[in-house]
Amino acid sequence: MFCYWGDDVRAGFGLVKPDGVKKTTSGVFFCSPKSRIKQLAPGKGLVGFVRGEGNVSVIRVPPAGGLQCGRLKNLELKDKIRLMSCGETQAVLLTYAGRSFWMDKHNHCRPIKELSSWNVIQVVCGDQHCMALTQDGHLFTWGQNSSGQLGLGKGEPSFLSPQPLKSLCGIPLAQICAGGDHSFALSLSGSVFGWGRNSAGQLGLGDTEDRYIPACVNSLTFKKTVFISCGEEHTATLSKGGTVFTFGSGRYGQLGHNSFRDERRPCVVGALWGSEVSQITCGRHHTLALVGSSKTIYSFGCGEQGQLGNGQRTDQCVPFPVHLPPDANHDQSVEQIVAGGNLSFVLCSQQEADNSSVHPESNRGRGILTLGDRMIDRWISECDSNQWRTIKKEIKRVFSSEACLNASFLKKSCDEHYQTSTSFSGLDMESVRAAVKRLAQKEKVLLEVGKIVEKDLLPSLGSTAVGAEALRVYLILPEILRVLNKRLHETKLTVELASALLKLNPSMLQALVKYWSELSDDFLKPLVKLFHKPSAHFVSQRTFNRQAESSDGHLQNLVHVLQMLYKVSCSGKRKITSGDFVIYEINVLFEICTLALLNSTPCIFNLEAKCNLLKLRQVRTCFRLVLRRSALLEDCFAQLRTANQTALKGWLQVVYSEKFEETDVNKRDFFLNVFRTLLEPESKMFIYNDTKTLIWFPAEPSLQEESYFLFGCLCGLAFYNNSVVNLPFPLALFKKLVGIQPTLEDLTELSPVLGRSLQYVLDYSDEDVDCLDMTFKIIWDNKEVELDPNESGKVVTSSNKKEFVDAYVDYTMNKSVERVFEEFKRGFYKVCAQNVVQFFQPEELRGVMVGTEEYDWSILKKNATYEELFYARHPTIVSLWEVFDGLSEKDKKAFLLFLTGFDRVPILGMNQVKMRVRPLLNSTEDHLPQALTCHSLLELPMYQTKRTLEAKLKEALYHKRGFWEE
């Protein structure tokens, strides 16, 4: 049965004889054409009918009050038509084979040659524009572009031929829809994109500004939208649960909101709430909704031409049932409702209601290709048969298309993929891995996939799609490349993928990084290996082949991706370690120009390489400090105060006015003594913890803030000149220098008692916390402080205990020292390049500056070398080590200070101390041992007895160390 109502038209549209058309009292006409109508395509000025056998008829319908309706005309086409869509005067037709035809106002049809090589699955028409969706997910638009309805960008002209809509490239589309002068696209995971005319808010974006490129309707995010229909100036959407949203023009009540006002954002049609609507359709100014379970059709909007089917010719702003013929309510089921122009249609059949009543998404037409188990199994089982040519074509269609891959492997359990966002991909990674594993069962199939990925897919990546669904391909591809690389032993595909990743716009790249953070270690670790292996290859190539400069760009891209993955691995508890990122080959690559390319990716450097990089500064100038021994700190600060930034970055030379000579010994002794002076309590620069082992900045400094700036410069000089100094700060200082916020753990290091107390507060039960009688008032650095200045005396409770602890840590580590720390930081970075410092983790930075206390004396002895008359079994050397082994730990540290100028071990360990021993020329047993600290050189008289050696060595260790203790 075929029902219709609305504009005055030829009886039965000419599908049946006039006497075969019946009419109800409510103005609904119905008839039973001999040839089954498969699809209806009403437009603003014509209606198309697709018959069950694929033949097409059209009839021209003039505007209301215009000329008489035309006659039904059959189109002479050799191809069988599956689908058609009509605009104001034109139509687009689609064959079962995916060929598309254009029908002009004279009903003449011609193939759309620009789409001849594409398998089209959906076509839609607005008043004067058209869209076509292909099987591999490409969207084309053409026609009038007066309001941006083609989505090609502002200022683009109208086009007579189809143009690719690149801004939606990669989005797996489920449906396309066109209104008067606006357009919509719906993704498989329910994202809604609109563009074009927005005069009444019909795009649902909260305003009335036209859009010239697709914009995501955020109000419909997570609503599980499965279908869209557009009127001339309004839009309706349907969710999977049967909820209807409408927006745009409400002038005729077509929104169904019990008002005639426009809505700029999607609003639920309240009268249909809970009815589980299964189909919706929009006419020019009216809307229909079908509740499949009750076979009830509701109408609302403009009724001037009787298009509401209620026997009235008045507008209606709330949904009311359409009075269908009795047969439609009893013996027949509603297959499809369609509205267009000022007409409404219903197709009924004798059969039981099929899925079209329950799942309105079937009304979209065919969907884009997806990669699934059946397809893969067929490829594997038939690839050695005469079907291989067909299989190759399918592989090309799927693996050359971002959209097809993005439509595959969705998490459909509990409709999870409808929650896709910039923080959730909606992708089932286990299914991805299983599918790739099956593909690898036939090398012939896998290699063909690799060929298409390399030739077609990878070069097309890097677009700036407007939706998160376009990013799934970047999670799928690594799984494919991982298997391909094992078979092919190549890296070029990974290089191309890295390049594509870095072409993504920043917001999309940030979303992808979020997706990575949600991956389990089983998927993240192979991802790290995928980019690490070619990175190491290029570094090795660069190390041993100076002609490999052409690969520097590839290397830079690869390590950039590695650095992003490193940050992901650090964000949670992972089995992935920092060692998984280190490229050990870089330790022998000391070419400045290449290392400069890698200076933003510290994850690939181990500590040894970082320290070597620090030594490789391209500095040719020196920064000279000329100091008086008696006014060391005063002279130092005076010269730092006036030094320019460029000069400070030179290699440090220290000269004493009393004895004008340049030696590295001067520099080491300078740092030793100047830091000793600054850290004495008498300097009043710092506060000490309870055990006097660590220092921190004061909340109320008694010295000028400039002192901390100069202290920062001094610390910067020590760092840049590879000098280990006494800097007993907690790790918090080094965290703050590299932009990492201190935590309760850092406060506990500074003040163990306080830190443990705060941890107890967090661990206490709610009842215990409420009984503590604590407030947000604390004492720090002998000063009372309200941690919540907006609420004096605020009580600590179970609900705010974390807030209290966080505020305590923030005050002690940040707020209380903000001014002095910022001065210190400013001074430090006046000397040091920030990107160099941030190469180091906080623990590494502290280790480089302060050294470690891992004293492995056996390594010192093992690495010692002997010169001139000395050798390992020389009696004096044997006595030396016997004496050394008998020294106390304090004396051994004093020996290290005497030998190197540092009393702590370099961060890389005792292996870095290369002790040399030679005889002291022209010496007697009365002479003390001497040391050249810049060379770790011990000059030792040839003492006749071990006893003499021991006495003289101990005397030397604690002898007054030079100039200022005369």
Give, region by region, the residue ranges found by the protein language model.
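Short glycine/serine- and acidic-residue-enriched loop/turn motifs that recur at repeat junctions
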Residues: 2-39, 50, 57-77, 94, ...
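Conserved core positions of repeat-based scaffolds
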Residues: 4, 46-49, 58, 90-93, ...
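Surface loop/turn motifs at the tips and blade-to-blade linkers of beta-strand repeat domains
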Residues: 29-33, 73-77, 112-116, 121-122, ...
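Short coil/turn segments that connect the beta-strands within blades of beta-propeller domains
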Residues: 38, 44-45, 53-54, 82, ...
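Conserved beta-strand position repeated across blades of beta-propeller domains
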Residues: 41, 85, 93, 124, ...
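Blade-level signature of beta-propeller repeat domains, shared across WD40, Kelch, NHL, RCC1
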Residues: 296, 302, 313-369
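C-terminal catalytic/scaffold cores in eukaryotic proteins
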Residues: 353, 365-368, 373-478, 482-499, ...
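Hydrophobic, conserved cores of late-appearing folded domains
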Residues: 569-760, 820, 845, 923-925, ...
